[in-house]
C-alpha cells in the first residue's frame, strides 16, 4: 500500500470527497487520491485551509478539484456541501470520512459531563453518519461506490478517552452494518484504525510523537501518508472483495497493548 508509480491512475475518472481534508490525515488522503488520478473535493469547517490544500494537489484532474465548507455537526451544512460537490464533480464514487478528534484532555471519568460525551459522539460518529446519508444516493449511482471511515485503535483497545473511544467503536459498528445493507447496491464500506499519527494534535515538530515512539514495535509513530495509503487501498478496486472490515494501521501497537500512557 505504499506509494509508487505502479499505482498511478487507479482512480482515474473517479470522484472522491474527503471530509476533514484540510489538514493532517485528511490532506494526505486528498493528495493521495489526486496523485492516483481522482477528481477530489475537500470538505472542511476551515474552508480557507481546504482551499489551500486543493491548491497543492497534483494529478491528472487537479484543475477540477474543489474545496467546500462543511460543518459535519450540522445536517443542513452536510447536505449542502455534498450537493455542491456533486454539482461540481458530476457525481460521487468515493467518500472518505476523516474528520474527528478528541479535545477532552483525557480527564477522569467522573469529570466527563454529558455535554462532553454528546460532543464527542456528534463529532466522531454522527458526523460520519450525516455524510454517508447525504452521499448515499450518489454512491448508489456509481459503479465503484466506496466509503472509508477513519476510526482509531482506541476503538479496539483501552488506551483511554472513553467518549472518543466509544464514538470510534460506534463508527466500526456502523461500518459493518452499512456494509451489509449497501452490498446489494455495490457499495463497499470499510474503515481504518490508526495509531498515533504525526499531526497537529501530536506535534508535527516531532517532540510529542518521539516520546510515544517506544510504544510501537516498528519504532516510530505513523505519518499521515501511512493512513492515506490504507484509505486509498480500501477505496480502490484492489479491495473490490473487501467490505465491512477495519484495517489497523498502527505500527504494531495493538500487538503490544496500551502499556503506560495513552493514545489518540
Residue spans of the language-model regions?
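Short C-terminal tail/terminal secondary-structure segment
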Residues: 2-7, 106, 232, 243-264
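Active-site loop of short-chain dehydrogenase/reductase
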Residues: 14, 62-64, 90-92, 139-152, ...
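C-terminal helical subdomain
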Residues: 2, 191, 210-242, 249-251
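Canonical Rossmann dinucleotide-binding motif of NAD(H)/NADP(H)-dependent dehydrogenases/reductases
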Residues: 9-41
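Catalytic loop of short-chain dehydrogenase/reductase
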Residues: 102, 148-170, 175-184, 196
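Substrate-binding pocket helix/loop in short-chain dehydrogenase/reductase
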Residues: 105-109, 113-118, 212
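Alpha-helical segment proximal to the catalytic Tyr-Lys
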Residues: 137, 180-184, 240
Amino acid at each position: 500500500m505504499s506509494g509508487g508509480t505502479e499505482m498511478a491512475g487507479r482512480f482515474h475518472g473517479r470522484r472522491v470527497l474527503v471530509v476533514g481534508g484540510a489538514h493532517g490525515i485528511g490532506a494526505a488522503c486528498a493528495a493521495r487520491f489526486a496523485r492516483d488520478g481522482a477528481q477530489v473535493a475537500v470538505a472542511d469547517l476551515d474552508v480557507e485551509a481546504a482551499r489551500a490544500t486543493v491548491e497543492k494537489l497534483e494529478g491528472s484532474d487537479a484543475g477540477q478539484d474543489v474545496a467546500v465548507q462543511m460543518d459535519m455537526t450540522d445536517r443542513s451544512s452536510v447536505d449542502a456541501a455534498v450537493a455542491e460537490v456533486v454539482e461540481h464533480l458530476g457525481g460521487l464514487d468515493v467518500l472518505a470520512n476523516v474528520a474527528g478528534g478528541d479535545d477532552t484532555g483525557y480527564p477522569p471519568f467522573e469529570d466527563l459531563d454529558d455535554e462532553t460525551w454528546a460532543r464527542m459522539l456528534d463529532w466522531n460518529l454522527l458526523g460520519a453518519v450525516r455524510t454517508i446519508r447525504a452521499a448515499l444516493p450518489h454512491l448508489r449511482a456509481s459503479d465503484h461506490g466506496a466509503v472509508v471511515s477513519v476510526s482509531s485503535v482506541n476503538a479496539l483497545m483501552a488506551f483511554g478517552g472513553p467518549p472518543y473511544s466509544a464514538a470510534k467503536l460506534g463508527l466500526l459498528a456502523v461500518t459493518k452494518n452499512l456494509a451489509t445493507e449497501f452490498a446489494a447496491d455495490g457499495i463497499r464500506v470499510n474503515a481504518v484504525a490508526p495509531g498515533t499519527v504525526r499531526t497537529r494534535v501530536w506535534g508535527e515538530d516531532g517532540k510529542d510523537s518521539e516520546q510515544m515512539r517506544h510504544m510501537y514495535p516498528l519504532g516510530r509513530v505513523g505519518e499521515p501518508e501511512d493512513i492515506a495509503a490504507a484509505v486509498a487501498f480500501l477505496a480502490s478496486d484492489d479491495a473490490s472483495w473487501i467490505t465491512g472490515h477495519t484495517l489497523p494501521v498502527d505500527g504494531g501497537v495493538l500487538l503490544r497493548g496500551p502499556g503506560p500512557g495513552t493514545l489518540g
